[in-house]
Amino acid sequence: MASVSSFRDVIANMYYNELFDELSEYIEDNPDKLESNSYRVQSPDEAALSDFDIITIDITDSPGNSILFDVIVSAEVEIAETVRRNRETDGIEQWFRISCRADLDDGIQNFQIKSVSIYNKYRESKLGRLSEYLVPIIEKEQFDDVATEFLNEFCPEALSTPMPIPVDEVVKRMGLKVKEIQLTKHFTIFGQIVFGDCTIEYYDRNERTYKPLEVSRGTILVDPNVYFMRNVGCMNNTIIHECVHWYKHRKYHELVKTYNSDALLISCRVNETTKYKKQWTPEDWMEWHANGIAPRILMPRSMTIKKIEELIKKNELLFGTYDRLNIMENVVYELADFFQVSRIAAKIRMLDLGYKEVEGVYTYVDDHFISNYSFKADSLHKNQTYSISLSDSFFEYYATNRF
């Protein structure tokens, strides 16, 4: 993967002069506000900026294409003071916060400096923070909140009653469109989202060759083999996955476009994983977001719990309250069918919501489902399982003495 320039680097390259001029004016107008640690100049009455370095940028997301950001700089400042008719001078280092805004639309537009102030390191961080690459900083515990935020905007009815998400309608409300096309010869890419008009390559099965195709901004490309090889649930998840990229990751791509005009889409590959990586790239974080948030959009927390409880009661009447294995197997099956997701997705969502009993049903290992099994509810802790793949077992055998 080509190296990615940070927002800090882009701002330094594009707007150094504007930042210098605004900071210089502030320093000249406010010498008395400087935090001087000089022995020779303790109360400066004159100050001038020599140079500065950008230490970091605190970036806050905003609606639409705009962003707010604070440029934190370390400045070299020449200060002076008249003491008993003697003119004393010295140089100091002072940190400043330069608050700015800009629009991201085919590059950085409408850059403005809003204010300059002495840096206060104890200033509270804002909500909706972005990384230095303009990727939202979202913790796993916030995924449900982001899903709710998404649904409030594009499908609020799904937050008041259990229902399958009308994926096609959500796409329409977002101003996007879906095009089904085989993206690769060996089905290694299930979906793509296009952030700018461009020409892509698709695989023509009849002629057994790759061909060019012009696609417009806001197009979701989905390989129809997602449906034929898997199920409609995987298709729905793929589409909503791409919607999450559009909803949360457009600003990253606007940043990349400032120095790489060809970076116009995200490709989502089959079995892509960041599990064993020590350091994640911006693309890794974005995939992690979409992988975690999309199922929560398709199965909103409160409505999913409501549906699960309804299905448990229904199946307890059929099997009796003690036949937990059959009850949970049916609940997973019916939950997947109701929300139009895969059985694996339904099971994972139930585990995420605290229904530990489903651990023993629909367990998919080494490309096949294994037999259902039951266990005591308190015998498994977080991140523990009774089933691992053959490759994982070999890894543990060689890497872990206890195993």
Name what the model sees in each region.
Residues 171, 290, 346:
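Divalent metal-coordination and catalytic microenvironments
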Residues 239-248, 289:
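Active-site His/Glu-centered metal-binding helix of metallohydrolases
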Residues 2-70, 302-403:
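Pan-zinc metallopeptidase signature
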Residues 189-216, 259-273, 313-326, 384-386, ...:
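Charged, glycine/proline-rich intrinsically disordered loops and linkers
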